[in-house]
């Protein structure tokens, strides 16, 4: 039977196969907001619609289409073990089951003609199939999808593919779902050949417990190789990552080669490659060891070193279905807090790099038939329980409240993806009776916190589920907060009052990761620099309630964020002292006006302003009818500017500068320059703030006028400006709000990697200049971009410009926080 034929008894199958046969195009799942991609086709080959974090309340309409990259990253197989293959259906029965004991997956349907169903029956050994049950968390299911018959993610494949696993979400906690898995079924809904919006709808309506059937390509077999390597002047000449507590690939404790150092022993030998897995060094087994142990084993070797490595199979080369490159996917996630790609030195034999910190190992109970965290409240034991947790990068992963008047210590919040959450043993509403034998039945909050802090790496907790007591305690806290709020409003004290600011919007001027804040009183909300937040309750001095605002509307998820006061207090404590830097306003040397002095925009304009601690900037929404100017700052800005204009000349342009220099014979006034006859007139215009930047070179004035920029903007083109950070503020004052993007280098080594002709001293100078630039103008940036290659940075910048090119933008508000 042809795969597009249907069973007359199964309307659902008929509709799906009819759609597949006709290839009927419906509106993309991300709604009517999307405009044609100015950077080429974005919806076809490999472009994701980016649905992420399915919520039990609403489904975000779209998280942004990713421009097609110019180069394809090297793909590293994950080696992930896959679950059982569904059994063959019994002839004559219409209810085949997965895993033997699961619910009926195809009621009233005897369809066995689908390609994937034939593969389940073992007709294709390239794929494995798995049933995955996920419990919808606070942030939804925790993954993004792309694809469908109306918008294939992979050429000639209408499947629905997983494009992103969100850290800390339900899918990441479960650990079985992976990027590039193809979703075949959501509960009773077949999504193997449907339009994208149908898959989104199925996930949205799936309920709190979601059963997925997924298909994934089987990992290729590894090749074991023995390599004898003679150390050179740079040691063995390669970098490693991974190990217990420092997983390079989530769920995998292996030690991986992540870099081959140019000119080193490994490169000269030629057999080792990035992505190889180290199994042993000399007689020391490197499987399931800590990162530090692997480094020590490689360091404590003689000149001749015996290595045993596992090389990944070549099946996934240039394969759209291949597993993701986890090296690039996961290492960037923690850059806000520590540079995990920074070199720790060669350690004599090998360069060591710290990777994305993975969650602690999950005990077997996580995959028990009925995990504790899925039990109904009435089924959960009320007897004291013994729980053993192992601290991770986020501590134990839960918050406590109580300790007043002998009321007890209660668990108030469990961090998604943290040790407590992954164990499934601890619940919100648990009363902590003891920690490592220390009795906490009558402890104060401070005593309980101290006991948990001193508990060491392995913590034994005795807890008792007391939801009624905790509920009474919560009610008491709520009443106290209401009293404090009313008192604050009536007294007129405090920084922000709900009664005064019922709808307050701010732009975040820093990155915040809720998983790294152990002091959160309740569910937190993570955000990045430049994100717009709707603060719906700012009455508390320490914590605000807020939700994220996307280009397509407000998120339904409400979370707690640190208040402006708390951010500044913590930062001052970190710095110990507040540093002040006068803003000189000195013009940058650039291509258009080399050697300009700062005679006309000197220290007098911005001098005296403090380097304030950046937290939040109040903003308001404004409608505009022009194309916003674009200012790129930081390393490689010239290359990015050139690429934007050359690739999209119909969308980007440059303005004509002014000068008092006499016109040359081959120059055209108004085309090469606006030639100003009177120096006095140009000086007056500069003083009247009609120029965003100006300076003097060889006794002639040069400058970029606001009117020149406006002329380009009103023609519908983004005016590319090669100017200093001072120009951002001047454009804002002129009601021409630029898209200001700062390229922030990850490290000196990263700069050298992107431009191998640079010396360390040159890269160090560029890095220092970039850090000073961020310190001086950070509050004016629209976005901050980082990447491991120029291609990655360029693609991110294009996406930011597209996101910021609508008719409605967020601009600074005169309100004071």
From Swiss-Prot:
The modification Phosphoserine is found at residue 139. Residues 501-571 form the SH3 domain. Residues 40-53 have a biased composition (Gly residues). Residues 33-101 are annotated as: Disordered. GO terms for cellular component: adherens junction; AMPA glutamate receptor complex; basolateral plasma membrane; bicellular tight junction; cytosol; extracellular space; glutamatergic synapse; neuromuscular junction. The keyword Repeat applies. GO terms for molecular function: ionotropic glutamate receptor binding; kinase binding; phosphatase binding; protein kinase binding; ubiquitin protein ligase binding. The modification Phosphotyrosine is found at residue 673. Residues 57-69 have a biased composition (Polar residues). Residues 130-217, 226-311, 379-465 form the PDZ domain. It is linked to Intellectual developmental disorder, X-linked 90: A disorder characterized by significantly below average general intellectual functioning associated with impairments in adaptive behavior and manifested during the developmental period. Intellectual deficiency is the only primary symptom of non-syndromic X-linked intellectual disability, while syndromic forms presents with associated physical, neurological and/or psychiatric manifestations. Belongs to the MAGUK family. Required for learning most likely through its role in synaptic plasticity following NMDA receptor signaling. This is Disks large homolog 3. It comes from Homo sapiens (Human).
């Amino acid at each position: 039977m042809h795969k597009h034929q249907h069973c007359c008894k199964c309307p659902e199958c008929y509709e799906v196969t009819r759609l597949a046969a006709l290839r009927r195009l419906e509106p993309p799942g991300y709604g009517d907001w999307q405009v044609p991609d100015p950077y080429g086709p974005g919806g076809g080959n490999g472009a994701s619609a980016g649905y992420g974090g399915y919520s039990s309340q609403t489904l975000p309409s779209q998280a942004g289409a990713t421009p097609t990259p110019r180069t394809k990253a090297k793909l590293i197989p994950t080696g992930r073990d896959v679950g059982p293959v569904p059994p063959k259906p019994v002839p004559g029965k219409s209810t085949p089951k997965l895993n033997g004991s699961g619910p009926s997956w195809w009621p009233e349907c005897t369809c066995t003609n689908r390609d994937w169903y034939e593969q389940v029956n073992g007709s294709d050994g390239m794929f494995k199939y798995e049933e995955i049950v996920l419990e919808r968390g606070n942030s939804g299911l925790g993954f993004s999808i792309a694809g469908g018959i109306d918008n294939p993610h992979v050429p000639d494949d209408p499947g629905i593919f997983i494009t992103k696993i969100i850290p800390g979400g339900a899918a990441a906690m479960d650990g079985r779902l992976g990027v590039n898995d193809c979703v075949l079924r959501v509960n009773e809904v077949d999504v193997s050949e449907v339009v994208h919006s149908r898959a989104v709808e199925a996930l949205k309506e799936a309920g709190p417990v979601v059963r997925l059937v997924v298909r994934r390509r089987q990992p290729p077999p590894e090749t074991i190789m023995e390599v004898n390597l003679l150390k050179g002047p740079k040691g063995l000449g390669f970098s490693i990552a991974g190990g217990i507590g420092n997983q390079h690939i989530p769920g995998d404790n292996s030690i991986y080669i992540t870099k081959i150092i140019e000119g080193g022993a490994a490169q000269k030998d030629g057999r080792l490659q990035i992505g190889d897995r180290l199994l042993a060094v000399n007689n020391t087994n490197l499987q399931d060891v800590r990162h530090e142990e692997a480094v020590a084993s490689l360091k404590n070797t003689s000149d001749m070193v015996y290595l045993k490595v596992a090389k990944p199979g070549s099946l996934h080369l240039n394969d759209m279905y291949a597993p993701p490159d986890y090296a690039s996917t996961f290492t960037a996630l923690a850059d806000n807090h520590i540079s995990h790609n920074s070199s720790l030195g060669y350690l004599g034999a090998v360069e060591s790099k710290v990777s994305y910190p993975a969650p602690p190992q999950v005990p077997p109970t996580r995959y028990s038939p009925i995990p504790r965290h899925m039990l109904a409240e009435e089924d959960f034991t009320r007897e004291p329980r013994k729980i053993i947790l192992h601290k991770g990068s986020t501590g134990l992963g839960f918050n406590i409240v109580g300790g007043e008047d002998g009321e007890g210590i209660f668990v108030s919040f469990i961090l998604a993806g943290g040790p407590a959450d992954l164990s499934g043993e601890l619940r919100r509403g648990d009363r902590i009776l003891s920690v490592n034998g220390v009795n906490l039945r009558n402890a104060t909050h401070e005593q309980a916190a101290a006991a948990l802090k001193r508990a060491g790496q392995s913590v034994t907790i005795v807890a008792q589920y007391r939801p009624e007591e905790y509920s009474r305690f919560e009610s008491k806290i709520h009443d106290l907060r209401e009293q404090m709020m009313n008192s604050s409003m009536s007294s007129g004290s405090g920084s922000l009052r709900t009664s005064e600011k019922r709808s307050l919007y701010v732009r975040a001027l820093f990155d915040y990761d809720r998983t790294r804040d152990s002091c959160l009183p309740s569910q937190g909300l993570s955000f990045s620099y430049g994100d717009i937040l709707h603060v719906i309750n700012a009455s508390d001095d320490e914590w605000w309630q807020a939700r994220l605002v996307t280009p397509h509307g407000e998120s339904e998820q409400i979370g707690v964020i640190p208040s402006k006061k708390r951010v500044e207090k913590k930062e001052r404590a970190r710095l110990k002292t507040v540093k002040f830097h006068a803003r000189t306003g000195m013009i940058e040397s650039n291509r258009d006006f080399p050697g300009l002095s700062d005679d006309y925009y000197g220290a007098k304009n911005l001098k005296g302003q403090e380097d304030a601690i950046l937290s939040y900037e109040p903003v308001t929404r404004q409608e505009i009818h022009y194309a916003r100017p674009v200012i790129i700052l930081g390393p490689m800005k010239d290359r990015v500017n050139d690429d934007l204009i050359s690739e999209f000349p119909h969308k980007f342009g440059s303005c004509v500068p002014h000068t008092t220099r006499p016109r040359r014979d081959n120059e055209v006034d108004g085309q090469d320059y606006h030639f100003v006859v009177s120096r006095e007139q140009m000086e007056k215009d500069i003083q009247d703030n009609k120029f965003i930047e100006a300076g003097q070179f060889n006794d002639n004035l040069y400058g970029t006028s606001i009117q020149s920029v406006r002329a380009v903007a009103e023609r519908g083109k983004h005016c590319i400006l090669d100017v200093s950070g001072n120009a951002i503020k001047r454009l804002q004052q002129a009601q021409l709000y630029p898209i200001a993007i700062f390229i922030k280098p990850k490290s000196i080594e990263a700069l050298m990697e992107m431009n191998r002709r640079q010396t360390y001293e040159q890269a160090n100078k560029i890095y220092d200049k970039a850090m000073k630039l961020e310190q001086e103008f950070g509050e004016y940036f629209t976005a901050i971009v980082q990447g491991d290659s120029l291609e990655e940075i360029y693609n991110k910048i294009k996406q930011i410009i597209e996101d910021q090119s609508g008719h409605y933008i967020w601009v600074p508000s005169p309100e004071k926080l």
